[in-house]
Amino acid sequence: MSKSAVSPMMQQYLGIKAQHTDKLVFYRMGDFYEMFFDDAVEAAKLLDITLTTRGQVDGEPVKMAGVPFHAAEQYLARLVKLGKSVAICEQVGEVGAGKGPVERKVVRIVTPGTLTDSALLEDKETNRIVAVSPDKKYIGLAWASLQSGEFKTKLTTVDKLDDELARLQAAEILLPDSKNAPQLQTASGVTRLNAWQFAADAGEKLLTEYFGCQDLRGFGLDGKEHAVAIGAAGALLNYIRLTQNLMPQHLDGLSLETDSQYIGMDAATRRNLEITQTLSGKKSPTLMSTLDLCATHMGSRLLALWLHHPLRNRAHIRARQEAVAALESQYKPLQCRLKSIADIERIAARIAVGNARPRDLAALRDSLFALSEIELSAECSSLLGTLKAVFPENLSTAEQLRQAILPEPSVWLKDGNVINHGFHPELDELRRIQNHGDEFLLDLEAKERERTGLSTLKVEFNRVHGFYIELSKTQAEQAPADYQRRQTLKNAERFITPELKAFEDKVLTAQEQALALEKQLFDGVLKNLQTALPQLQKAAKAAAALDVLSTFSALAKERNFVRPEFADYPVIHIENGRHPVVEQQVRHFTANHTDLDHKHRLMLLTGPNMGGKSTYMRQVALIVLLAHTGCFVPADAATIGPIDQIFTRIGASDDLASNRSTFMVEMSETAYILHHATEQSLVLMDEVGRGTSTFDGLALAHAVAEHLLQKNKSFSLFATHYFELTYLPEAHTAAVNMHLSALEQGQDIVFLHQIQPGPAGKSYGIAVAKLAGLPVRALKSAQKHLNGLENQAAANRPQLDIFSTMPSEKGDEPNVGNFVDKAEEKHFEGILAAALEKLDPDSLTPREALSELYRLKDLCKSVS
């Protein structure tokens, strides 16, 4: 493309676009942001806006699409959600100031991970950007949130990278554009940077300059040991500087995070427990949506953070528990007060990057005054006392804002009426000139009528022609000589006089000067607030923590959550535990006990489909998770020993992108658990071995259960439909059989959802199929085949003895030749017990009793 063949304006655009080839360029032209060439085509498709043309280049029409300046935020939000980055190119020069096009430059770059504008952000979600820097042994992670000032780093490994990214919920991921960059499960939101930007030396230099220190040891970072983490942090800080066109002043130090701080949860566990997103990708009903009674958006974001980061430090947990207990009698007035608090965290972020608006400062002022008035009773905990002590520290800032900003300023600075009266004498004088113009006009009108004797004379103003004197057509010819004609109308003439012209110049000049002065003063206020940013961030964090703790108190009081106890020995004891989400969705929820300790580490859970096995297992995990956030738990009582990780293998689907079947996904998740679970881990395993042949599945399920018992020794809830596994407690005393009960009523089934000792009597699969609406013919066929299979199994037991030839690890033959016999015996006992349990001898007639006796005899024949 020849530059001589394009206009000066298009040459300017092409020069700017050449510096941002990987981004859409919003090029400001008057009241629109325009896009050209391929940007226009892509934007028109993504935003569903009109694609048009403007002029030609090399004989071809130039594609063009645009969005209005005043509505740009909604379009930016849509592009960012699609993972696009946008360079905002503004007019920075004066129109007509010189030859050629108006001077323009890119003032900021909007990317998914560097947003600060509230219109582009979800109120209750933290927006993070993560940098990933690999070497041969470790992967360095660094992440930041421009909204909160969070800035952290960590060393991890390749096999844990996707789990870390799931925990951080990154909106944008920075990767080196090199061959050794790790492969991620997701490609969305990934930005490739030159590999040299991740160099540790350059990173350390940038970080030490930013924090004003000689080295990074004070942050727990050693130059050699943490080289990749330092490289990631340096690349991240430099990226933020480039996109924001300035170095942010509000990043809250740099801290090194370790695995020992939080209970570990891999990506599958976070997904299966539906902490902040359902399995179908929705935001409700989840643990977060169910517990979120927060009064502020800051509190909601912190609650999500706590749920994804359950603590291991018992002292910190107990401090939160004490605060929750102290607030139980005063959380209602506290939450009422907190509802008036604006999003201080995000306002501080906008101040830091220089794009705060007038009403941001007004909301900040009002919020700081409101926080200083929060009162807590004398019995408050030490944590509450620490949080409350932060608020008075910002009173001087609130007072400065009260003096500087009008009580209700304009939305936009360009409209004026932002700076308070009395803040600046010159501004007050300019406003007086503007605001007292009406008095001058009335006086002038009265004086001119008296001087000329013209009764139709009026002095008025409009935006097109400014100030003027209007006379009717009949009196216009009598106008004095000093009246200069300005406009002719059908029934009137408009004039200007030297006196009125002088006043007009004075008013218009005053208006321009006032707007310019207000902008100057507002920028000065923003600059002064930069020094207050650390205190503002402390206030935001304290208010958010107070909000979450008061929410925990509300849950304890209104939903009967109890304070869990912590033990130093291995135990998970829960009395009448409830699923915190499900109990809010149903009228009646059946509470259940859980007892695991050093003697009983694996609960073998059997029972019918729809019986509640998965709900029960998730319930136990969520109670353990909640206890480690400092929240009280949905139970009558709970005692929990040391927990380091929570693992789940509950349900799965094909991973088509990686060409992995459902069974492969399940086995991969199972393998990860067996490799990483420890004696202090909680493991949930649901129907291991399904998706392959019966014998393969049974063999795998048996092997996994044994591995958990003998090698991992984790606390495990192991749900299965393989009744043959219920022999395990006889071979392993650390295993215990439990089942979810059900009751047959004629041809119908009632799920009791009650955990009871022993194995289940049967699986009730056909009964569940009936509930699902299978045709009667199919149900009858299924029952017929089931009866045949059961009879065949009973007549040919040896064919099911699949473990009789399995060598043990020591090489000797295990004594499990009677494995199936024992399993079937237990199966029969369960069926018989269930049948007897239903009977009420006192209510049976003699004929009914005899009929039941024959039915039981037939039952014995069919199973024996």
From Swiss-Prot:
One of its GO terms (molecular function) is mismatched DNA binding. SMART domains: MUTSac, MUTSd. PROSITE patterns: DNA_MISMATCH_REPAIR_2 (PS00486). The keyword DNA repair applies. InterPro entries: DNA_mismatch_repair_MutS, DNA_mismatch_repair_MutS-lik_N, DNA_mismatch_repair_MutS/MSH, DNA_mismatch_repair_MutS_C, DNA_mismatch_repair_MutS_clamp, DNA_mismatch_repair_MutS_core, DNA_mismatch_repair_MutS_N, DNA_mismatch_repair_MutS_sf. Gene3D superfamilies: 1.10.1420.10, 6.10.140.430, DNA repair protein MutS, domain I (3.40.1170.10), MutS, connector domain (3.30.420.110), P-loop containing nucleotide triphosphate hydrolases (3.40.50.300). GO terms for biological process: mismatch repair. Keywords: ATP-binding, DNA damage, DNA repair, DNA-binding, Nucleotide-binding. Belongs to the DNA mismatch repair MutS family. This protein is involved in the repair of mismatches in DNA. It is possible that it carries out the mismatch recognition step. This protein has a weak ATPase activity. This is DNA mismatch repair protein MutS. It comes from Neisseria meningitidis serogroup B (strain ATCC BAA-335 / MC58). The gene is mutS.
